[in-house]
């Protein structure tokens, strides 16, 4: 999470330079119009606030690929990372053993055919290529939380999740809601500049639960 690891060829040694006071008005921010047409007032309010801040918002279309069919790639990668845990049967010691708990995800992943894994990764590369093309024209995009979670897990694009208000549940509890800002690969500085500006002007992060 901090610095490069010369034993991991997938990690690059790159500088991180972020000026929290840099100008945000030069940023080009995308949003998927159809995602904000849903009945989530706080998400729509986020777009309104960004426009009030004078930011340049443009409508975009995310790559049209069945990313949900590639979710098992992440399960296989997680299973490989925790292979020793499964082989040693120490996964039995984990408390949650429900169908979709991690121990059973690790176990099921061992049954996925290698051919299917390779084919899915070929499609994943196409998605990554299309996302790179999209992000070359914008600095970041805004999305309702979880809408782009699987997509960015597959492509590696950085994401900042921010509070964007509160809503009342059916049980009359008031719970916080959130919005996601997704940036370019190695574009965390611009991503954090936009996120900090939004957070500072809204102040939702300053609201704490009452004891």
Regions found by a protein language model. Give the residues of each.
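Glycine-rich, small-residue loops and helix-cap segments
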Residues: 1, 84, 111-211
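A short helix-breaking turn/cap at a secondary-structure junction
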Residues: 1-44, 202-211
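Flexible, glycine/charged-enriched surface loops at secondary-structure junctions
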Residues: 6-12, 54-63, 92-96, 206-210
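Acyltransferase
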Residues: 17, 38-61, 82-93, 117, ...
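Short helix-loop capping/hinge segments that flank enzyme active sites or metal/cofactor-binding pockets
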Residues: 23-32, 72-125, 163, 170-179
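Structural recognition of the beta-strand scaffold that forms the well-ordered cores
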Residues: 31, 59, 142-143
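Solvent-exposed loop/turn segments at secondary-structure junctions
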Residues: 35-37, 65, 147-149
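Short connector loops at secondary-structure junctions
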Residues: 55-72, 106
